[in-house]
């Protein structure tokens, strides 16, 4: 994989999210969350960051981008889906100290998932702007459209 340029699988994933988003936003509940202003973030294990903001309201885009960044960096640092990490920590099944994230900074909401490319590259994926379950679902559906990409 060319580390200096774009990653074709990640580009295909972003395109799949773009294609799927109107179907999700057809639900009035998800549309009302941020008026269709959503953000996608992807981080490769080496720290390369990809992303896309959707919509027209820069203030709302900035807000969803901040949440997507927080979800994505938490997955990147921990390897666990958002929500699952907190569940493990708060049930005393996982010591959070090796990850370096203070408890007040845990995101706690669904929408961040670990992924992997066929070549073994680990990814942190996050979406923000809809209900948390749909933030996750759009990531799952988009990954299913990209050959060699999986959600862990």
Where are these predicted regions, by residue range?
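Flexible, solvent-exposed loop/hinge segments and secondary-structure transition points
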Residues: 1-117, 121-151
């Amino acid at each position: 994989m060319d580390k200096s340029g774009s990653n074709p699988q990640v580009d295909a994933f972003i395109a799949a999210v773009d294609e799927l988003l109107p179907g999700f936003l057809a639900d009035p509940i998800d549309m009302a969350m941020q008026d269709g202003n959503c953000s996608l973030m992807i981080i490769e294990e080496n720290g390369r960051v990809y992303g896309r903001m959707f919509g027209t309201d820069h203030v709302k885009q900035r807000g969803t981008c901040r949440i997507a960044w927080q979800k994505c960096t938490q997955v990147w640092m921990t390897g666990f889906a958002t929500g699952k990490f907190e569940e493990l920590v708060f049930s005393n099944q996982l010591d959070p100290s090796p990850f370096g994230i203070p408890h007040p900074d845990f995101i706690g909401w669904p929408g961040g998932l670990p992924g992997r490319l066929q070549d073994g590259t680990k990814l942190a994926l996050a979406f923000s702007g809809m209900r948390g379950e749909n933030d996750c679902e759009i990531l799952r559906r988009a990954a299913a459209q990209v050959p060699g990409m999986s959600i862990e």
